[in-house]
């Protein structure tokens, strides 16, 4: 299985900050990297597919970058509604494994 290592596991940022979340795969993913946002009591929402392509309706404050084994989700600027847990997922090989998640909170 492909192992997905996501950092940091938790993050506190101020409104308006630029936030970056990293994901590293144990082998080359080509373009098969997705990012999800999950809020408490809700199913995960697909934000970004194929590394950098935004799903319809996702604001362009969100962006994805990277290639090969190293990928980044960036939120700029952070807004209150962005408080959630974020996951990367690879779809290069089955099983389609996830990173451990990053819980993003607002620094008050």
Curated annotation (Swiss-Prot):
GO terms for cellular component: immunoglobulin complex. PROSITE patterns: IG_LIKE. Residues 50-56 are annotated as: Complementarity-determining-2. GO terms for biological process: adaptive immune response; immune response. Residues 89-97 are annotated as: Complementarity-determining-3. The keyword Disulfide bond applies. Residues 24-34 are annotated as: Complementarity-determining-1. Residues 98-108 are annotated as: Framework-4. Pfam families: V-set. Residues 1-23 are annotated as: Framework-1. InterPro entries: Ig-like_dom, Ig-like_dom_sf, Ig-like_fold, Ig_sub, Ig_V-set, IgV_Light_Chain. Residues 57-88 are annotated as: Framework-3. Disulfide bonds join 23-88. Residues 35-49 are annotated as: Framework-2. Keywords: Adaptive immunity, Disulfide bond, Immunity, Immunoglobulin. The mixture sequenced contained at least two or three different light chains. This is Ig kappa chain V-V regions.
């Amino acid at each position: 299985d492909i192992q997905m290592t996501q950092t940091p596991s938790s993050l506190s940022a101020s409104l308006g900050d630029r936030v970056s979340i990293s994901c590293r795969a144990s082998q080359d993913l080509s373009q098969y990297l997705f990012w999800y946002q999950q809020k408490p009591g809700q199913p995960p929402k697909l934000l970004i597919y194929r590394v950098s392509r935004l799903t319809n309706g996702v604001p362009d404050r969100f962006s994805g970058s990277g290639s090969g084994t190293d990928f980044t989700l960036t939120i700029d600027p952070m807004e209150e509604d962005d408080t959630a847990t974020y996951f990367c997922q690879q779809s290069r090989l089955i099983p389609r494994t996830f990173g451990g998640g990053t819980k993003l909170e607002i620094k008050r």
